[in-house]
Amino acid sequence: MPSINTKQYDGIKPMYTPDAAEVCGSHVDIDFPAAAFVANDLIRLATIPAGVRCVDYKVVLPDVDSGGSPAFAWSIGELNAGGTDLATVYASGITTGQAAGVYRAVNSAHFEASAAADRRIAMKITTAAATYAGSGKTGVAVFDLQA
């Protein structure tokens, strides 16, 4: 399975961004494909524009690993210039998706990231699912953004 882009990442579906000091919740749908992800695949989520800070984020995932010993794990962060890997990792070793659940930022790496330039945010699959069960399921990433 190759890496995928969300509709927000590709500009097909708008990503809401704040135009003032209020915090705006911006939702990014994650449509899981029929084919299983393998290690190092990327789910390119969205671009946070320059001048906008991410104050918090959550990722809500369905159960995408139905194996008796689930293995699915991922990281989240900013893509490198080529869009081929994470250059800045906000969090790693995340296992949400082994069972349905919510992952919420547990450190401030996303908040401390420079807002001087656009940041392309992605999830990187670090361990493939033991038994992939994501086909046709949808998750969501919610970025709380502030201008």
Q: Regions from the language model: what does each represent?
A:
Residues 2-147:
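Surface-exposed, low-hydrophobicity beta-strand/loop segments enriched in small/polar/acidic residues
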